[in-house]
């Protein structure tokens, strides 16, 4: 009984601590210029449908990524998501949507092995050599993404993709409660993701990341 109580307190403490810490680096779009220029904007992937269309959360992320880019906070965008199968590709869907908005493919880098939040942040630093980043995802997800990024040594900030109207999904919110404690261990021990590859510096040629 005591053990269960202690675990519950730790569980709640980890969640609250990560939320408070992560949110201290979250900015509204209108104030993001306060952080100065960033190496890149990281747009994190989410589900795409069989017909290639974006899920609502992914559409929010891409649209906020576009707005951030056009605000001038960074000259580079890194779209990071799951492209583990030939018939499932979050990354090129995001890239195509950004191109349709008028952003040149020459400034859009693609990370095809961003299978989870940790992999995306690790690869942003180690493969794309970013140092200062602005992360775009939903508000519930930002604290964990920022926490992981900063534990890995990135100077990371965030803008909520849903700042104009919060995205809420009960299943997703509950899953996030359990994901935060799990990623504490990744942040501490810093495991190497399965997929590595050659360095593609974010200040170089975006076409080198195409796939």
Question: For the regions a protein language model found, what residue spans apply to each?
Answer:
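Proline-rich intrinsically disordered, low-complexity coils
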Residues: 28, 57, 181, 191-193, ...
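N-terminal membrane-anchoring alpha-helices
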Residues: 1-35, 195-202, 209
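A transmembrane-helix-recognition feature enriched in membrane-embedded lipid enzymes
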Residues: 170-195
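Electropositive, surface-exposed helix/loop patches at the edges of structured domains
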Residues: 115-121, 141-149, 191-211
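A structural signal for short, hydrophobic/glycine-enriched beta-strand patches
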Residues: 18-174, 178
């Amino acid at each position: 009984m005591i053990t269960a109580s202690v675990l519950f307190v730790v569980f709640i403490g980890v969640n609250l601590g990560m939320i408070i810490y992560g949110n201290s680096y979250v900015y509204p779009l209108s104030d993001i210029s306060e952080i100065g220029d960033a190496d890149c904007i990281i747009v994190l992937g989410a589900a795409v449908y069989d017909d290639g269309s974006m899920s609502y959360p992914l559409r929010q992320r891409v649209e906020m990524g576009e707005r951030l880019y056009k605000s001038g906070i960074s000259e580079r965008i890194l779209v990071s998501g799951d492209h583990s199968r030939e018939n499932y590709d979050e990354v090129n869907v995001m890239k195509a949507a950004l191109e349709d908005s008028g952003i040149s493919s020459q400034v859009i880098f693609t990370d095809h092995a961003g299978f989870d939040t940790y992999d995306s942040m690790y690869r942003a630093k180690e493969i794309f050599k970013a140092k200062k980043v602005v992360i775009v995802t939903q508000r519930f997800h930002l604290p964990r993404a920022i926490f992981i990024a900063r534990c890995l040594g990135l100077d990371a900030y965030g803008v909520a993709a849903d700042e104009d109207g919060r995205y809420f999904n009960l299943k997703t919110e509950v899953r996030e409660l359990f994901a935060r404690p799990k990623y504490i261990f990744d942040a501490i021990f810093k495991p190497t993701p399965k997929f590595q590859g050659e360095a593609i510096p974010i200040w170089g040629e975006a076409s080198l990341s195409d796939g």
